[in-house]
From Swiss-Prot:
Essential cofactor(s): Mg(2+); Mn(2+); Ca(2+)
Subcellular location: Cytoplasm
Regulation: Supercoiling activity inhibited by novobiocin and coumermycin, DNA wrapping around gyrase is not inhibited.
Alphabetical keyword list: ATP-binding, Cytoplasm, DNA-binding, Isomerase, Magnesium, Metal-binding, Nucleotide-binding, Topoisomerase
Protein name in UniProt: DNA gyrase subunit B
Gene: gyrB
Assembly notes: Heterotetramer, composed of two GyrA and two GyrB chains. In the heterotetramer, GyrA contains the active site tyrosine that forms a transient covalent intermediate with the DNA, while GyrB binds cofactors and catalyzes ATP hydrolysis.
Entry binding sites for Mg(2+) 1: 504, 577
Bias (Low complexity) ranges: 1-26
Length: 720
C-alpha cells in the first residue's frame, strides 16, 4: 500500500508567525448565536482547565488497549473519538453543528463551531495548550471538572490517541479572534510551532487526520457505518446538526442514495434521500445531514418505523428531568411507545455512550415501570385481587424505549465498560419515570388500560409457554442432565473448551457427528422447521421443538431467567448450507438468539461456520475447496497455469448442501480448528441490530427489499 501524503497539506508554520500570548484571556470569542442548550456549563475552558496525566509512549505499541482493535472497528473508533470532542462542546451548550468529511485523499476532516481548543500557554507544561492536548495522553478538559460538567467522549484523550495512530494530523483552531494552525506527523510529532493566522470572528476546531496504514489492517472508512453512528448521535443531542460528506469517488455500481427520507427537522435543508444538492454535478459525492429538534421522541418514531406494527397508543411518551443538588449534575431523557410487537426494544445511553450492558439507569427505569403499571392496574381494578402481579417482561412486551442519562462523573463497569455503575442514577431515573409516566397514565386512562391489557395477554402467553415447556419435559425420554435426545454431546465438561454446532438436517448432522472431535465438539441437528420468532409470541416460540432444543442444550434459559454463567458451550456455531436456503436458516437462528438470548451475541459466543461452495478435484494435485464463484475461477486458472489437471466429469463439484460432503471433508473444511474459518457474530449497536432484524424478518416487504438492495453490495460491513 502506497503511503501518499495528502494532496493539499496545510502550510508549514513560518518563523514570522506570532507566538500565543500567555496572558490571553481563555474565554472564547464570538460564541454561537443559538447554543444547543439554554444554560451553558459554568466555568472557564482555558489553559488552566486542561489537566495533564501522562504521555503517548504506549499508544503505538499497544493500540488495541486504547481503541479496541486495529481492524475496521478500531479504525472507525478514531472518527468517533474526534467527533466525541465536538459533541462535548454541544453538551456544554457551545456548539450547534459538526461537519465530518471523508476526503478523497484518505483523510477525515471534523469541524465544529464550539469554543476551540485553548491556544494560550499551559501553566505547567510551558507549551501551547492545543499542543499539550494533541500530544499528551489524558490531557483534557474533562478531568479537572472546569471545562465540562458532562463529557461523552474522553476530551483530549481521544484526540491525542488519534494523533498517535495517524501519519499526519492538521489542527486548526478558531479562537480569540484568530485562526491558529499546527500540524503533526508520524504518530504525533509536532511539525513546527503553533501558527497564529488570519483574523476571524468565528470559533471552533477543525481536525484533519490520516490513519497510519502501518498500524491498521485497512484505512478505508465505511460511509454506512459512520452514517448510522452519527444519526444516533443526532438523536441523542436534540438540536445538534451533524453532516457527513463523502468526497471519495464511488464505484459505478454502488448505490449512492441512502433512502433517508424525512429524517431532517422541519425547516432544515436536508436533501431528499440523503443526497447532497449538487449530486447531479458531482455524482461521486454523497452527503447527509441529521438534525432532530425532538431528540429521543424522533428516535423512537424512527425505530418503530422499521417495524410493520400497530401502535397501542398514538403519541410517543416523552419526558425529561434534571437534578443539580449536592453539587452534582444529572439529567435524564426518556421516550417510549408500546406497539403490537412481541419483543421489547429498550435502549440506554449514558453521556451519549451506548450502554448495551445496561446499568443502574436501566434498573431504575425497569423497577419504576413495573411498580407503576401494577399499582395503576390494581387501583383501576384491571387486575383482579386474586391475580398475580404482571412481570416486568410482560409489561415491556412491544415496548420501544430510549433512556438517556447525562452525569457529571459517570462510572462505567462490565466486560466492555458499557454498563453504568452510578448508584445515584437508579433512584433518580426511577423517580422521574414514576412521576412523569404516572402523570401520563392519569391523563390518558384509555391508552393506559390498553397497555395493561397487552401486558395481561403477554402474561397469559408466558404462563402457557411455561406449562407447555414443563409438559414437554415430562413427556420426552431425555438423556443425561435433561439434554435433548438428538444432541450428540461432547465428553468435556469445561465450557471454555466446548463448542456446539447447530446443524440443519439429518444427513448433515450425521456427517458432523462422524467427523467431529467428540471431546470438545457437540452436534445439535435441527430436523423440523425453525419458527420466525419475529412474528410469533413467546408461547408459540417455545412450542417450537427446534427452539426448545436449543434453549435446553445451551443451559442458559431465556428472557428474565437467562443466566449466562450456566452456558455449557463457549462457542455456538451455526452451520448451514452455503446457499440461499442456508442463509435463510442462519438468519432465522440469529433472530432467535437476538430476541431471546441476546447476551450470547454481546459476549461473543455466537459464530458462523463457513462451509465451502465448490470442490475442485485435481487429478495430479490435492483437491481445492473454495467458498465463492470468484474463488473457484481464480483457483481453476491458477491450477491450470501450474499444469494441474481435473477430470471432465465432476471436476468442479458444487455442494448443494452439507449432506453432500462426507465426514472427512466436513472436518477438513469446516470443523477442524486448525484449518476452519469461523465468523464471530458481533453487535456494535443494539438499536441498529433491532431495526435490521425487524426489517429482514418482519412483515414489511418493501422495507426489506430496499434494505437488501442497499446493503448487498457491501455485506462485509453488516454488523449484527
Amino acid at each position: 500500500m502506497v503511503d501518499a501524503m495528502p494532496e493539499n497539506p496545510a502550510e508549514e508554520p513560518t518563523a514570522a508567525s506570532a507566538a500565543p500570548n500567555p496572558e490571553a484571556v481563555p474565554d472564547a470569542v464570538g460564541q454561537p448565536e443559538a447554543p444547543v442548550k439554554d444554560r451553558k456549563v459554568p466555568g472557564e475552558y482555558g489553559a488552566s482547565a486542561i489537566t495533564v496525566l501522562e504521555g503517548l509512549e504506549a499508544v503505538r505499541k499497544r493500540p488495541g488497549m486504547y481503541i479496541g482493535s486495529t481492524g475496521p472497528r478500531g479504525l472507525h473508533h478514531l472518527v468517533y473519538e474526534v467527533v466525541d470532542n465536538s459533541v462535548d462542546e454541544a453538551l456544554a451548550g457551545y456548539a450547534t453543528g459538526i461537519d465530518v468529511t471523508l476526503q478523497a485523499d484518505g483523510g477525515v476532516r471534523v469541524a465544529d463551531d464550539g469554543r476551540g481548543i485553548p491556544v494560550d500557554l499551559h501553566p505547567t507544561e510551558g507549551r501551547p495548550t492545543v499542543e499539550v492536548v494533541m500530544t499528551i495522553l489524558h490531557a483534557g478538559g474533562k478531568f479537572g471538572g472546569g471545562g465540562y460538567a458532562v463529557s461523552g467522549g474522553l476530551h483530549g484523550v481521544g484526540i491525542s490517541v488519534v494523533n498517535a495512530l495517524s501519519r499526519r494530523v492538521d489542527t486548526e483552531v478558531r479562537r480569540q479572534g484568530h485562526v491558529w494552525r499546527m500540524s503533526f506527523a508520524d504518530g504525533g510529532v509536532p511539525q513546527g510551532e503553533l501558527v497564529k493566522g488570519e483574523a476571524t470572528d468565528a470559533t471552533g476546531t477543525v481536525q484533519t487526520f490520516y490513519p497510519d496504514a502501518e498500524i491498521f489492517d485497512s484505512i478505508e472508512f465505511d460511509y454506512e457505518t459512520l452514517r448510522a453512528r452519527f444519526q444516533q448521535m443526532a438523536f441523542l443531542n436534540k438540536g445538534l446538526r451533524i453532516t457527513l460528506t463523502d468526497e471519495r469517488v464511488q464505484e459505478s455500481n454502488e448505490v449512492v442514495d441512502d433512502e433517508i427520507a424525512g429524517e431532517g427537522a422541519a425547516g432544515e435543508d436536508v436533501a431528499e434521500n440523503g443526497l447532497a444538492e449538487d449530486a447531479e454535478q458531482e455524482p461521486q459525492r454523497r452527503s447527509v445531514t441529521y438534525l432532530y429538534e425532538n431528540g429521543l421522541l424522533d428516535y423512537v418514531q424512527h425505530l418503530n418505523s422499521a417495524k410493520k406494527v400497530e401502535y397501542v397508543h398514538d403519541d410517543v411518551i416523552a419526558f425529561e428531568a434534571e437534578d443539580f443538588s449536592d453539587g452534582r449534575s444529572m439529567a435524564v431523557e426518556v421516550a417510549m411507545q408500546w406497539t403490537s410487537a412481541y419483543s421489547e426494544s429498550v435502549h440506554t445511553y449514558a453521556n451519549t455512550i451506548n450502554t448495551h450492558e445496561g446499568g443502574t439507569h436501566e434498573e431504575g427505569f425497569r423497577a419504576a415501570l413495573t411498580s407503576l403499571v401494577n399499582r395503576y392496574a390494581r387501583e383501576k381494578e384491571i387486575l383482579k385481587p386474586k391475580e398475580d402481579n404482571l412481570s416486568g417482561e410482560d409489561i415491556r412486551e412491544g415496548l420501544t424505549a430510549v433512556i438517556s442519562v447525562k452525569l457529571s462523573e459517570p462510572q462505567f463497569e462490565g466486560q466492555t465498560k458499557t454498563k453504568l455503575g452510578n448508584s445515584e442514577a437508579r433512584g433518580f431515573v426511577s423517580k422521574a419515570v414514576t412521576d412523569h409516566l404516572g402523570d401520563w397514565f392519569e391523563r390518558n386512562p384509555g391508552p393506559a388500560k390498553e397497555i395493561i391489557r397487552k401486558a395481561i395477554m403477554a402474561s397469559h402467553a408466558r404462563l402457557a409457554a411455561r406449562k407447555a415447556r414443563d409438559n414437554a419435559r415430562r413427556k420426552s425420554p431425555l438423556e443425561s442432565f435433561g439434554m435433548p435426545g438428538k444432541l450428540a454431546d461432547c465428553s468435556s465438561k469445561d465450557p471454555e473448551r466446548c463448542e456446539v454446532y447447530i446443524v440443519e438436517g439429518d444427513s448433515a448432522g450425521g456427517s458432523a457427528k462422524q467427523g467431529r472431535n467428540p471431546e470438545t465438539q457437540a452436534i445439535l441437528p435441527l430436523r423440523g422447521k425453525i419458527l420466525n420468532v419475529e412474528r410469533a409470541r413467546l408461547d408459540k416460540a417455545l412450542g417450537n421443538a427446534e427452539i426448545q432444543s436449543m434453549i435446553t442444550a445451551f443451559g442458559t434459559n431465556i428472557g428474565e431467567e437467562f443466566d449466562i454463567s450456566k452456558l455449557r458451550y463457549h462457542k455456538i456455531v451455526l452451520m448451514a448450507d452455503a446457499d440461499v436456503d442456508g442463509q435463510h436458516i442462519t438468519t432465522l437462528l440469529l433472530t432467535v438468539l437476538f430476541r431471546y438470548m441476546r447476551p450470547l451475541i454481546e459476549a461473543g459466543h455466537v459464530f458462523l461456520a463457513q462451509p465451502p461452495l465448490y470442490r475442485i478435484k485435481w487429478s495430479n494435485a490435492p483437491h481445492d475447496y473454495v467458498f465463492s464463484d470468484e474463488e473457484r475461477d481464480a483457483a481453476v486458472e491458477a491450477g491450470l497455469a501450474k499444469g494441474w489437471r481435473y477430470p471432465k466429469d465432476n471436476g468442479v463439484q458444487r455442494y448443494k448442501g452439507l449432506g453432500e460432503m462426507n465426514y472427512q471433508e466436513l472436518w477438513d473444511t469446516t470443523m477442524d480448528p486448525e484449518h476452519r474459518t469461523l465468523l464471530q457474530v458481533t453487535m456494535e449497536d443494539a438499536a441498529a441490530a433491532d431495526a435490521v432484524f425487524s426489517m429482514l424478518m418482519g412483515e414489511d416487504v418493501e422495507s426489506r427489499r430496499t434494505f437488501i438492495q442497499q446493503n448487498a453490495k457491501d455485506i462485509r460491513f453488516l454488523d449484527v
